Amino acid sequence: MLLSACTLFAGFAQWEPAGDKIKTTWSEQVNPNEVLPEYPRPIMERTNWESLNGLWEYAIINKGAALPEVFDEQILVPFAIESALSGVGKRVSEKQELVYRRNFKILPDWKGKQVLLHFGAVDWKTDVWVNGVKVGSHTGGFTPFSFNITSALLPKGENQLLVKVWDPTDKGYQPRGKQVNKPEAIWYTPVTGIWQTVWLEPVSKKYIENLRITPDIDRRLLTVKAELSETEPGD
């Protein structure tokens, strides 16, 4: 109990909102040690999973520069770096990139499983490394994406996760809604980086990747199509 209390206090000591713009009752209840703890996907809920939300290290680098070795500051994931709840409240220009880093451990009962790394959404262009191995890239600020990181994991001990994001906001061609670098009379700001839950999930070698559910009201039918990770004749 004492250890838990100390850990909780340490988390709060390292984080506080950056300013007080657009505060709500819910923003005042944010706990850096338990950020958005609910299962993040509305379908295919699995019992075993591990949230990676919380305090991460971050650095802002020039676009195209080498990945940093030193990270001096912290950010609360999954809140965009421009937001108050990130604890940072900084802008990242189209000439810069945002790099995140954190360590994680794989639970012992996940041994022998495939491990998926999920991102609810990252704005905009994302590259991901695990233990120095690039596991994938994704372009798009609104859609979830996942990588199978099993082959990049260490057999024991801590693993390192590195995420690099580039977002040109209104200097690019991507869909961005009301995000602008100079909002003038409105409060809309750019949304750069991780802004939805990040989590790990153990699965079997064959698992359901996605479900496509199609209703037919006239015929009173519901068709469910499961997309599998690997298929063989007879599956």
Q: Can you annotate each of these PLM segments?
A:
Residues 1-7:
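Bacterial N-terminal signal peptides
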Residues 12-49:
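N-terminal pre-domain segments of enzymes
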Residues 54-77:
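Predominantly extracellular/luminal regions of secreted and cell-surface proteins
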Residues 57-61, 90-208, 231:
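Accessory beta-strand-rich segments of carbohydrate-active enzymes
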Residues 70-91:
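Aromatic- and Gly/Pro-rich amphipathic surface segment
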Residues 112-114, 217-225:
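Short coil/turn motif common to extracellular beta-sandwich-like domains
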Residues 128-130, 221-235:
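Beta-strand-rich binding/interaction modules
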Residues 210-217:
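Short beta-strand segments of immunoglobulin-like
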